[in-house]
Amino acid sequence: MFFITLIKWKQAPTKEIIDGTTKKLDDIKKQGIKFRVYWTLGRYDAVAIIEASTEKDAMNMLLAFQGMVDTETMVAVPREEAIKLL
């Protein structure tokens, strides 16, 4: 399953915060969850594209950052799969 997560920092990120999130992301990789994070300009500070087996796995990943960021997550269906549903 794929998920798109829009991210806003709750406070301006410092080197310590970034180091902490990097450690958490490294731990998440070891759990087999694939993701890419892009910092963005505009209303959101970053966007993450997550590939996880279940919604529960994706939610557990995001809960690791509770208190640090606000998120909005959407399930993403690959275009090819969505077209098959038409």
Where are these regions (language model features)?
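An amphipathic, aromatic/His-enriched active-site/gating alpha helix that lines ligand/cofactor pockets
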Residues: 52-83
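Short S/T/G/P-rich N-terminal loop/turn motif that feeds into the first structured element of a domain
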Residues: 1-30, 34-35, 40-45, 77-86
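Short, well-ordered beta-strand segments in beta-rich or mixed alpha/beta enzyme
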Residues: 4-7, 41-63
